[in-house]
Each structure stands twice: as C-alpha cells, then as structure tokens.
Amino acid sequence: MIYSLKHLNKYLPEIKLDQSVTKALESLGFEVEFFEKFSSSKGLLFAKVLNVFDNPNSTKLQVVELDTKLGELTIQTTNKVLSKGDLTICYPVGSSYQGKEFQEVTMQGYKSQGMLASFSEIGYDNSLLTDKDQILVLPKNFASLNDDASEKLELNDYIFELSITTNRNEINSYYFLAKELAAYYNTKFSCEFLDAKLKQSFESSFKFEGNFLDKNYSFTLLEAKGKVSTSFEEKLLLAKHKIDSKFNPAVNLTNLVLINLGIPIHVYDKAKLKSTKFSVGLYNGKVNLLGNKQVEVSDALAVFNGDKVVSLAATMGLEESKVDLQTSEFIFEMASFPSKLIRNNAKEIKMNSNASNLASKTITKYQVKLAHKFLFNYLKDLKLSNVVNDFELDKKVEINFDEEKLQRYSNGLPSSEFIKAFDKLKLLEFEFENQKIKVPLYRYDVSIFEDIIEELFRFYNYDNFKEIPYIQIPGELKADNKNFKEKLKALGYSEARTFTLVNEKDSKFDPLDLSDAIKLETFVSKEREFVRNSLAISLAEAVNNNKKKKINNVNLFEVGMVNANLFYACLATTDKSFLELKQDFVSFFDNLNLEFKKPKNQFLHPNYSAEIYLNDQKLGWIGKINPSFLDLDCLFVEFKYDLYFDDKFKKYEAPNLDVLKSIDLTFELNNNEHLQKYLDKINSVAKVFEIKEIDDFKKETSHNVSLRITAPSAEIDKLNSHFNKD
C-alpha cells in the first residue's frame, strides 16, 4: 500500500515524522519499497486575482494581475477561467517545478512574471480531482496570501510504499500502521473517531437473513439520510492514493474508510433497492459491474437485496444499485467475508479492485467495529439508523507465558530484559496479567507463544542482541569452512543469510531434482510455509531486494540447508559473466574432472545454463533460472557443499612445467546437434588446459564449429594423431 507521511503524522500529533521513519518501519519488520517526495514544486504562492483582461495584441492570451505575499504580479495565460476576486496559485519568477525555473518574459507587449498552475502542474493527477485540466480556482476562504501553499496543499509530503506480509493485512491502513509507530516511538496515538457514539435518529427497516456466514465473519448495515460532504483536503488525500473523488461524497467516504482502516465497505442508493431483506450467498450468472462492464461469474460471493444481486462481496458494486450525485438516502454495508471467496471473485471478474486486494486476506470483525465508529463520526450531522445485524466482539485469545521458552530463543535473556518491549506491546492492546497474555482482537496471526516472542523481539530491536559467533558444521564435515568463505570473499562475493522456509510458489523451484517440498504443519506466514529445494531461489529474493534499493551490481554467496537436510553452496551474481562465474567455481576444484551438460531440468534456462556432473553424478548447476518461472537477470552456481571438503577430491599433482601449445579443430554439427559429445571426446583423448570456441560457420542444414584447444605438447600430439588422421 502507498502512504502519505503527512496524513500518517496526523495520528501521531506529538512528533514530526521525517525520512528517518524508514528505519523505524524496517526495524518493525516492514520492507520499504520506495520513499520519495510527492511533488517537485518549489516556491508556489497563493494569489488573489486583482484584474483580468484580454491581451489586445493577441486573441489567445489573457493578462491576469495578482496580489501575492511577494507583492503584485502580472502573469499571462491562455486558460481563461479566472475572474476578479478568485483565489488561485502561481509560480513566481525564481520558483520551479520538475526542475524548470520560471523566468520573466514578455509576450505580445505585456510581461509575464511566472506561471499560473493547475492540479497537474503541482504534482496531482487532475483527472482524479476535476473534469478539466485548468488553472486551479480555490474557495476564497481556503487560505490567506501569507499561507505556505506547499503546506496547505500538502505538496511538501513524502509518499512511500510498504511490502506487507500476508499475516499483517491490517497494516495496509493508516490506523494500524500509526499504532505500530506510536508504540515504537512511545508517543501519543490520536484518533478523532475512536470514541464516536451512534446518534440514532430512526429504526432501519432493513434486515439481514441467512446463515451463509459463520461466527468468524460479519455483515452489518447502517442507514443514513442527508447530504454527505467530502473536504478538499480529503480529496487531495484520495488523489495521492490514485483514487477518483469526482463521485458522490458517500463513495469518497467508503474509500476513506478503506485507506484509514484497511477494510472495504460499500454504499447503496436506498431508492434503487426493491426489498428490505439482505443476504449473502454464491451466485452464477451475469452481472453489470460499475462502469457498465458485463461479466459472467461462477460461484461468486454476492450480496443480495431480496433475490437480486446488488454487489459482489468486498469486490465491486453493480450499476443497478450504485449511488449517484443526486442520492440522498444511503445504505452502508460494513462486513467481513471469507478471503478465499473474495479471491475467487477477483478471478471471476478478471480484475483486482482496491477492495478485493484487501479483502482477499483476512479482515477482522474488530475492523468492522472501527468502521462503525468512523461512520458515526463522519456522518454525525446526518440522520442515522441503528446498526443492522450488529454484534459483540469475541473475547481476546489467551496465551500462557513461558519464561523458559523466551530465554531459549533469546539466548538466555530473562523476561526482565524486555520490560520496555512489554510496555510497547501494551500500547498495541496486548494485555499481560497472571502469566497470561491477551492478544488484540485485530491480531489474528498471533496464536502461540512463539508469536509473542516475535513481537517482543521486534520492539526490543534485533540490533540490541549481542552477536554470537556462528559456527556451522554441515553434517559430518570437519574441514575448513572458514577458508572456503574467505576464498569467496576474496573473489568479491558477500555472504548472505536467507530463510530456509519459502512460500508455496518458490518451493516448486527444484533445479537439484530433490523431491516434493516439505510443508510445515505450523508456520508464521504463507511466505514461510515450505522448506526450500534450492538456495538459489532465496538468493534471488535477496538480489531483487538489492535492486529495489538501486544496488544493481550484486555478488552474493550462501552456504545452507535445503530439502532432505542437504547442505549446498550457492553463488549469485549480476556483475560477472557466465565464464567468469564458471571460473570462480572451477577454481575451487582444479583437480576434478567436472562435466557441464545441457540442462534437462525444466527450471533452468535452456540456452543459458548447464548441469554439473562428476562421474555421472549430478553435483549442481550453473546459469540462469528459466524466465518462465522467474524473470531475473542474474547468474547462479549451486553445488553440493561436501564436494569442497571430500578428501578423495584433494589429490595433489606435480605441476607440468612444459610450455603449453594449441591446436585448432573443426567439427561439423547438424543444426539441432549439441557440441557436448565432441567436448567429451576431446577430454577422453587428452588432458587439456582450455577449450575455446573461435568460429561458428552457419550452413543450410549444419554448421562448422572451430575449437582452439590448449594443452601440454604431449597432449596436443595425442589430439593431432586422433583427429587429424590422413
């Protein structure tokens, strides 16, 4: 989700957030995808129109005389929308936008001291705010001329995106992210709607029927009569989220709930509903989605009014029941549905909406209750009904405290060491009493004490743990592990540590031909559910993370466990060529008769990879991942770790001091024939130092490949007598 730093800061009134918040977010376990200024606008001013007249020397230009805090200015424009007394915005001489500095110019006999601006010329997408891209005319009481335009229009904002794990879906909202930061900074969390109460004016005639949803889900309605309004600032916030605000303000309200609380809600035009009965169930047939897009769905979770479908649950509304600019009586639906069925809805209509993106993961009943309060506060000046089909929240889940387990995971630290972390968790609605821990109702992912430990460690900060020497003894190996790593570091590789567990998709990556991935019975999240079949898929994730941080030249290595308790080593590089990577690998095993064969494994790039064999036993692979599985411009070599340590491979041979010679051999290959059998033949005849391809002459049905073989004189004689017979 994308966030506005200024709006997030409104929940934390006693501190000022800045770019350093990225460190806090990453410390809390949230990966920052990007963090950037919202607008490049500099020096923008509010301006009052003093006079407007057409340039007598031009049929297109209009001269606008303005009053600003810098004094009076004259600016010419072709966009003739301003009148005397209007409040607008302008770039004076010396200000800039997108790196362009504005200068004073003379046009058709009149000076122009800057530029008047529209939404699109200060950083916003005008199509989300207005029907026409024209000079901005503001309400006359919106600002004074002395106000900071960048502050008032929230241009001096930062926009950032977080990558959220599937088990923390609630963080896709300002409310819950702000709570995390309030605990992290130990500062006040402020929320104007949190104490809102329902001011009921009438009893709704609508009812919810049916038992399709079990007790883990909810479906509630709130009826409202009157005019809903959206503030200018709220429209700007929605625009930052790429959300159109040119609809009935009631629709804008549903989107404000979406981004603030992370829960999709829906609104219906009461006048278009033919029944007082609502229900939920599966639907098969055609529906007319918002935007007049007709689709046919199968087993889609739908909301019914009587026997008529009025929306696809938490996915998209329908044209027949939508609110328009004339609607004055509204039915707001606030609900939580089975996420699996919402994912099916998105699949059926072949698109993901903002609503389905959130509801395809768990939405808690606690969030539904928060949505009630948000509406109670926002609609307090309207006539409101009772909440139809309201419910009581369940009791908090209780987990037994386990001191011994905490010390085991923290390397002997007592619970007293985590006092500050306990206090921070209390700010997040965790309760600690009588060796029991009560879990907040929105934390559906916390169910065992190990989850509590993870929360404690997050707020204790992993940097506070003292580093302990890491000793890894793979199996029965007792050779010099440190020497192996030092050699790789000398070759320019940095050691990486990745998770042994991966998600279901990545677990299918099996270039080593091991076996079906092992699925854990209990797991922290869907991202860490299976034991990996390859180190390369984990290093690929590390490479991608580096690329997101604009680190494009990466050389990594890892030694670790894969499926079946096997230890492998893997090198990953975006900086070296295939031959350079191969040479780095071969440099460890100079005395081995390794073979590089065309890959048969479906996960390897067929034209840019090879499988590594020794005595007909597959030891690993080198090259790229098949782009049909993962499109990543990165080379890998992955091999059995014990290959480096096995003494039978450590044979010493006295160096041959003879001067090396070379011979050129040419072989004719059919167009679909591989070169490997000729390489095998050369290696069986003589012990060569190097083989290089120097030419490849194409013919209609075949091609001639010329190889240059370098070897000691005696070996060259063997090749000459074998291949160059009269």
From Swiss-Prot:
Pfam families recorded: B3_4, B5, tRNA_synthFbeta
Entry-linked SMART domains: B3_4, B5
Comment on bound cofactor: Binds 2 magnesium ions per tetramer.
CC terms in the record's Gene Ontology section: phenylalanine-tRNA ligase complex
Domain tRNA-binding, residue spans: 38-150
Protein's UniProt keywords contain Ligase: yes
GO biological process, one term: phenylalanyl-tRNA aminoacylation
Names of the cofactor(s): Mg(2+)
GO molecular function: ATP binding; magnesium ion binding; phenylalanine-tRNA ligase activity; tRNA binding
Enzyme class, UniProt record, top EC level: ligase
InterPro entries: aa-tRNA-synth_II/BPL/LPL (IPR045864), B3/B4_tRNA-bd (IPR005146), DNA-bd_dom_put_sf (IPR009061), NA-bd_OB-fold (IPR012340), Phe-tRNA-ligase_IIc_bsu (IPR045060), Phe-tRNA-ligase_IIc_bsu_bact (IPR004532), Phe-tRNA_synthase-like_B3/B4 (IPR020825), PheRS_beta_core (IPR041616)
Keywords, sorted A to Z: Aminoacyl-tRNA synthetase, ATP-binding, Cytoplasm, Ligase, Magnesium, Metal-binding, Nucleotide-binding, Protein biosynthesis, RNA-binding, tRNA-binding
Binding of Mg(2+), residues: D445, D451, E454, E455
HAMAP family per UniProt: Phe_tRNA_synth_beta1 (MF_00283)
NCBIfam families: PRK00629.5-4
Matching PANTHER family: PHENYLALANINE--TRNA LIGASE BETA SUBUNIT, PHENYLALANYL-TRNA SYNTHETASE BETA CHAIN AND LEUCINE-RICH REPEAT-CONTAINING PROTEIN 47
UniProt family annotation: Belongs to the phenylalanyl-tRNA synthetase beta subunit family. Type 1 subfamily.
Name of the featured protein: Phenylalanine--tRNA ligase beta subunit
Species in which this protein is naturally found: Mycoplasmopsis synoviae (strain 53) (Mycoplasma synoviae)
Encoding gene (name): pheT
